[in-house]
């Protein structure tokens, strides 16, 4: 699986839709397979995020004895990942995310970086290069 440009715990800005302009922390990132080929391999996959306090939906839930009361609860709904932008922790602006590979000695590190301020956001992966 490819590295994610938006991860759990990131602060994002909603850039499209009814909730446009709202900010929040990413609670969950997941994907849904929309279509599969004849062998059962995913062909069309959509990525979604759940953002804290954004796209609140009402759910009608039945009571479960000893666990919860029944009634109407409010919870966050999914937003397509293309409708949110990461807010850079360094410059505090909404930005696109890129990946940068840095080789230091025999270690190869992959970073996410802000395309506005060109600063590293966080380390994605680290590999030790054999021989060479």
From Swiss-Prot:
Domain of life according to the entry: Bacteria
A family per Pfam: ribosomal_L24
TM ranges: none
Annotated GO CC locations: cytosolic large ribosomal subunit
Keyword terms of this UniProt record: Ribonucleoprotein, Ribosomal protein, RNA-binding, rRNA-binding
GO terms under biological process: translation
GO terms, molecular function: rRNA binding; structural constituent of ribosome
PANTHER family: MITOCHONDRIAL RIBOSOMAL PROTEIN L24
Homology family: Belongs to the universal ribosomal protein uL24 family.
Function: One of two assembly initiator proteins, it binds directly to the 5'-end of the 23S rRNA, where it nucleates assembly of the 50S subunit. One of the proteins that surrounds the polypeptide exit tunnel on the outside of the subunit.
Assembly: Part of the 50S ribosomal subunit.
UniProt-recorded name of the protein: Large ribosomal subunit protein uL24
Name of the gene encoding the protein in the UniProt record: rplX
């Amino acid at each position: 699986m490819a590295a994610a440009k938006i991860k759990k715990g990131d602060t994002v800005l909603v850039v499209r839709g009814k909730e446009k302009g709202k900010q929040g922390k990413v609670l969950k990132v997941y994907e849904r397979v929309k279509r599969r080929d004849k062998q059962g391999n995913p062909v069309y996959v959509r990525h979604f995020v759940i953002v804290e306090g954004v796209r609140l939906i009402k759910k009608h839930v039945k009571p479960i004895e000893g666990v919860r009361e029944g009634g109407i609860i409010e919870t966050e709904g999914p937003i397509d990942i293309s409708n949110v932008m990461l807010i850079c922790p360094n410059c505090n602006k909404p930005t696109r995310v890129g990946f940068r590979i840095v080789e230091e000695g025999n270690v190869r590190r992959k970073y996410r970086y802000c395309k506005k301020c060109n600063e590293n956001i966080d380390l994605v992966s680290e590999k030790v290069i054999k021989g060479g």
